[in-house]
Amino acid sequence: MLRYNLGMGLILASASPRRSELLRKARMVFRVEPAHVPEVHTAGEDPKQYAQRLARDKARAVAAKYPNDFVIGADTIVVADAHVLEKPADEADAARMIRMLSGHTHEVTTGVCLCGPNVEIVETETTRVTVAEISDEEIADYIHTGEPMDKAGAYGIQGMFSRWVTGIEGDYFNVVGLPIARVYRMMRRAGVL
């Protein structure tokens, strides 16, 4: 397990089981304290700035309660055809999103904020993902698994959707939900490790 300097704790400001799993696999000791902040994309807001803003808002919200600990806030968005695709509102929305991804390359951006005593680092990681053509029947079958309903862009690259991923440029773990190598570098730079 990683040991942290300064005797401080590490908090993940997210309820995402995928983010928790990635941190655990990286042998980081942390606790989960989900942040509850509005996730509203304003018209004209750059997608990367949007991801950074949400990550910062989440980290700050939790850091305000635990000022002596380090907090990781993150937000992942999918951008296809200049449209930000967040978590689908319902099955019809999920189908719409998957049709946008089908046969195209899109970007997945995660904003990450590390907040702690006298430290705030905010960065983004962007990965390009290419998806094969997906038939309407395949889309319906995929949606009925329930897998896309709690994920940005209506898919999980680590699950059934992987059968349609034909290429990836960048950090795979970013697409899962947390660019763990970037988080590690941020923690080193902040003196946490």
Swiss-Prot record:
The active site is at residue 75. This is dTTP/UTP pyrophosphatase. GO terms for biological process: nucleotide metabolic process. Its cofactor is a divalent metal cation. It is found in: Cytoplasm. Keywords: Cytoplasm, Hydrolase, Nucleotide metabolism. It comes from the Bacteria. The lineage of its organism: Bacteria, Pseudomonadati, Acidobacteriota, Terriglobia, Terriglobales. One of its GO terms (cellular component) is cytoplasm. One of its GO terms (molecular function) is dTTP diphosphatase activity. Nucleoside triphosphate pyrophosphatase that hydrolyzes dTTP and UTP. May have a dual role in cell division arrest and in preventing the incorporation of modified nucleotides into cellular nucleic acids. The keyword Ribosomal protein does not apply. Its main location: cytoplasm. It catalyses: dTTP + H2O = dTMP + diphosphate + H(+); UTP + H2O = UMP + diphosphate + H(+). The record marks 18, 76, 158 as: Important for substrate specificity. Belongs to the Maf family. YhdE subfamily. It holds the Pfam family Maf. Its EC number is 3.6.1.9.
